[in-house]
């Protein structure tokens, strides 16, 4: 998309603990322009409702977006609810189970999506939320030049914990400073974040071992 639309910007947004900064670096290695890490103890224990609230709040802070792309579902809860809930909270159209973006026009997008028994081609207005199916083509590989450019990119927390001996590097090269946001930074409501904002409660966990 970025190559086909000169002047466009790709922004990475992820929510998680400090180590989730690795996801942002990986995106930068593959051609993204910038990234934001949504991290705060107050986000811990979030179900899909609280997760989608936090992400939608951060997206509003980032500003105008034409296309918001996310995975279909996480590998733990496996519910596929966060993407649609983000779309609902932002008041945007959504296309789920996307396999390929066929065309992006001035005010609409054409997408091929996976359905039971085949595929279908659909159109949607911009801005839009798209969740990508596992059958989509793999993302672009790492770019060696970008790996060299961003390999020292760090969040404030990482720099504080790392006892780095090249801190002046971050003053000279602002693109190496990864942004991390707390609940307060995105003007979030604590009552809607983490366990406080999660109506889903885990009653029990059982390990199942297949013989």
Question: Where in this protein do the model-derived segments appear?
Answer:
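N-terminal glycine-rich FAD/FM-binding segment characteristic of electron-transfer flavoproteins
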Residues: 1-211
């Amino acid at each position: 998309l970025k190559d086909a639309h000169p002047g466009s910007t790709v922004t990475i947004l992820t929510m998680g603990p400090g180590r989730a900064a690795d996801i942002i670096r990986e995106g930068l290695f593959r051609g993204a322009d910038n990234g934001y890490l949504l991290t705060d103890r107050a986000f811990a224990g979030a179900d899909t409702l609280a997760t989608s609230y936090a992400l939608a709040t951060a997206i509003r802070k980032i500003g105008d977006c034409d296309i918001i792309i996310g995975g279909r579902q996480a590998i733990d809860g496996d519910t596929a609810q966060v993407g649609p809930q983000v779309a609902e909270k932002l008041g945007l159209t959504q296309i789920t189970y996307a396999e390929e973006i066929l065309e992006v026009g001035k005010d609409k997008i054409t997408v091929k999506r996976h359905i039971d028994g085949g595929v279908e081609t659909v159109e949607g207005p911009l801005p839009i939320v798209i969740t990508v199916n596992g059958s989509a083509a793999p993302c672009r590989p790492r770019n060696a030049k970008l790996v060299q450019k961003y390999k020292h990119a760090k969040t404030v927390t990482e720099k504080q914990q790392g006892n780095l001996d090249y801190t002046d590097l971050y003053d000279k090269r602002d693109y190496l400073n990864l942004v991390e946001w707390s609940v307060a930074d995105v003007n979030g409501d604590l009552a809607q974040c983490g366990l406080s904002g999660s109506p889903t409660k885990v009653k029990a966990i059982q390990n199942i071992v297949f013989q």
